[in-house]
C-alpha cells in the first residue's frame, strides 16, 4: 500500500465540505483507507455517503458551523465559497483550509507513476478505459474516476502499486495543482467561459499543465486537434501523439463500424502494426479516447495483444451512451454530453446505432455556457429527428435573464428545418409526450450534465404502470 505522506502539522482529522461529490468522496475513501479520521458534510444524502459512513466517516447533511468540530484540516470543493458557514467557522478557529484540487495533488505526489487525464471532452471514458486495461494487466493502480464504473464498484479503487490515475479538469485551473508523470491531453475546446476569458486563456492553462510533467515524464496528446497542436512547442518532457493522421506516433487506420455502431480499427505505432482493436462503446470520438488509452498502456509495458483483449471488455460507464432499457421497441439511452462538440459526437454515434427516428432531449447546463456557445449549440443537433429542449440546469449559477431555453429551441429549429424542435419544461410532460409519440425502432437519447436522465427513467416507469 502506498502511504500518503501528509504534512504532519495537519494532524489526523480531515473535514471535507461537499464530501458527497464524485471526486471528494474518492478523496475521503483514500484518506479513510490510510487511517485518517474523516468527517464531512453535503447538502443531500446519497448511496456514496452511506458507503463512506459504512467505512467510518462522520457525515452531516446540510452545511452548519457546528459540523466543524475539531478537524486539523478543512477541504472544500470549488462550489463552496468563502461565505459557507463551515468555511467561516474554520477561519474563525484558524483551521487550515485547502481546496479539493490541492488535496488531490498531495495524494498524487506520493505515487511515482501518476497519470492525469485532461481535455475538454472524454476524460471520464478515457480514464475508465486506461484504468481497466491497467487493472486487467495486474498493474493494480489506484483509480479515481469521475463517474460510476461497474468494474471497480463505483468511482474509486485503491490499489497497491506506484500507479495512480485520475481525471484532470481545467476548470478554475485546478489541474495545475497536480503532479503527473504521464499527462494526457485529449482535446481543447471553448468551455467553462464563466472562468476563462477566451480560448487562448484555456490553451494557456493547458500549456501550464504540460509544464508540470517532469523531463523524464510523458505527454500523450491528440495530434489531430488543432488547439492541442498549437501548445506542443518547446516541450521538455517526452512527447507521444495519437490520431488518424499518419504523422502521429500512434495512428488508427482501416476504420469500420459494426451493425451496432461499435468501431473496429487497426493501430500503427511508429509505422509498425499493433493489430486490430475492437470497441464495445459507440462513436468515432471513442476511437480517439481508445488511442490515448492504447498509447498509455503500451507506455506502461502492456503488450499489444493484452491491450486488444482488455479494451473490448470495456462497455462504458454510467451516463456515457448508457442504455437504460427498452420500451415499446425503443431503446432509451442517456448521455452526459453538455457541450456542442459532445452533443455532435454523441448524435453521430447514435446515427450509427440501429434506429428508426432519433429523439433527443437536451438539458442545457449552466447559463454562462449556454449564452457563450448559443450559436454552436444551435448547430449541434443535425442528426436528431425530434428535439426537445428543457429548462437550463443552473448548477452553481444564478439566472440573470440573459438566455433562455426557448431561445435555443428556436435557433435549433432555424438550423434544422428537417427536425421537429420544441421547448418543454416539465419532465413528466416530456416523458408522456415521447411515450405517446415514439414508434418501434426509435432511439430516445437524453443528454446533459444535470438531472435530465430522470426523463428516461420516467418513460420506462410509465411503461410499467
Curated annotation (Swiss-Prot):
Keywords: ATP-binding, Cell cycle, Cell division, Cell shape, Cell wall biogenesis/degradation, Cytoplasm, Ligase, Nucleotide-binding, Peptidoglycan synthesis. The keyword ATP-binding applies. ATP binds at residues 119-125. Disulfide bonds: none annotated. Pathway: Cell wall biogenesis; peptidoglycan biosynthesis. Its main location: cytoplasm. It catalyses: UDP-N-acetyl-alpha-D-muramate + L-alanine + ATP = UDP-N-acetyl-alpha-D-muramoyl-L-alanine + ADP + phosphate + H(+). Its EC number is 6.3.2.8. Signal peptide: none annotated. GO terms for cellular component: cytoplasm. GO terms for biological process: cell division; cell wall organization; peptidoglycan biosynthetic process; regulation of cell shape. It holds the Pfam family Mur_ligase_M. InterPro entries: Mur-like_cat_sf, Mur_ligase_C, Mur_ligase_C_dom_sf, Mur_ligase_cen, Mur_ligase_N, MurCDEF_pg_biosynth, UDP-N-AcMur_Ala_ligase_MurC. It is found in: Cytoplasm. GO terms for molecular function: ATP binding; UDP-N-acetylmuramate-L-alanine ligase activity. The keyword Repeat does not apply. Cell wall formation. HAMAP family: MurC. NCBIfam families: murC (TIGR01082). Belongs to the MurCDEF family. This is UDP-N-acetylmuramate--L-alanine ligase. The gene is murC.
Amino acid at each position: 500500500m502506498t502511504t500518503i505522506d501528509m504534512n504532519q502539522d495537519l494532524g489526523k482529522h480531515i473535514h471535507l465540505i461537499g464530501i458527497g461529490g464524485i471526486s471528494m468522496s474518492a478523496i475521503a475513501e483514500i484518506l479513510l483507507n490510510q487511517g485518517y479520521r474523516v468527517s464531512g458534510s453535503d447538502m443531500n444524502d446519497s448511496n456514496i455517503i452511506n458507503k463512506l459512513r459504512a467505512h467510518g466517516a462522520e457525515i452531516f447533511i446540510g452545511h452548519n458551523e457546528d459540523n466543524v468540530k475539531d478537524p486539523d484540516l478543512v477541504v472544500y470543493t470549488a462550489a463552496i465559497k468563502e461565505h459557507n458557514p463551515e468555511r467561516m467557522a474554520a477561519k474563525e478557529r484558524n483551521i487550515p483550509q485547502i481546496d479539493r484540487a490541492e488535496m488531490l495533488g498531495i495524494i498524487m505526489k506520493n505515487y511515482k507513476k501518476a497519470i492525469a487525464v485532461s481535455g475538454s471532452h472524454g476524460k471520464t471514458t478515457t480514464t475508465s478505459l486506461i484504468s481497466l486495461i491497467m487493472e486487467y494487466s495486474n498493474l493494480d493502480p489506484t483509480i479515481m474516476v469521475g463517474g460510476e464504473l461497474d468494474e471497480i464498484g463505483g468511482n474509486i479503487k485503491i490499489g497497491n502499486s506506484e500507479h495512480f490515475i485520475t481525471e484532470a479538469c481545467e476548470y478554475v485551473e485546478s489541474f495545475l495543482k497536480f503532479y503527473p508523470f504521464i499527462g494526457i491531453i485529449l482535446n481543447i475546446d471553448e468551455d467553462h467561459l464563466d472562468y476563462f476569458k477566451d480560448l487562448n486563456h484555456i490553451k494557456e492553462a493547458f500549456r501550464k499543465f504540460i509544464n508540470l510533467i517532469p523531463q523524464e515524464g510523458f505527454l500523450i496528446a491528440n495530434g489531430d486537434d488543432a488547439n492541442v497542436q498549437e501548445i506542443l512547442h518547446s516541450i521538455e518532457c517526452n512527447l507521444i501523439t495519437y490520431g488518424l493522421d499518419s504523422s502521429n506516433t500512434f495512428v488508427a487506420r482501416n476504420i469500420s463500424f459494426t451493425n451496432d455502431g461499435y468501431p473496429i480499427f487497426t493501430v500503427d505505432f511508429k509505422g509498425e502494426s499493433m493489430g486490430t482493436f475492437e470497441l464495445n462503446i459507440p462513436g468515432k470520438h471513442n476511437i480517439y479516447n481508445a488511442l490515448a488509452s492504447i498509447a498509455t498502456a503500451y507506455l506502461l509495458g502492456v503488450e499489444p495483444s493484452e491491450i486488444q483483449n482488455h479494451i473490448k471488455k470495456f462497455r462504458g460507464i454510467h451516463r456515457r451512451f448508457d442504455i437504460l432499457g427498452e420500451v415499446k421497441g425503443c431503446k432509451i439511452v442517456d448521455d452526459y454530453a453538455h457541450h456542442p462538440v459532445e452533443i455532435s459526437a454523441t448524435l453521430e454515434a447514435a446515427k450509427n446505432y440501429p434506429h428508426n427516428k432519433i429523439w433527443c432531449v437536451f438539458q442545457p447546463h449552466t447559463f454562462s455556457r449556454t449564452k457563450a456557445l448559443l450559436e454552436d449549440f444551435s448547430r449541434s443537433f443535425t442528426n436528431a429527428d425530434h428535439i426537445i429542449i428543457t429548462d437550463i440546469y443552473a448548477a452553481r449559477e444564478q439566472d440573470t435573464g440573459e438566455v433562455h431555453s426557448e431561445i435555443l429551441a428556436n435557433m435549433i429549429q432555424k438550423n434544422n428545418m428537417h427536425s421537429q424542435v420544441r421547448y418543454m419544461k416539465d419532465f413528466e410532460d416530456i416523458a408522456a409526450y415521447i411515450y405517446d409519440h415514439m414508434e418501434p425502432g426509435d432511439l430516445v437519447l437524453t443528454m446533459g450534465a444535470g438531472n435530465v436522465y430522470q426523463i428516461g427513467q420516467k418513460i420506462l416507469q410509465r411503461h410499467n404502470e
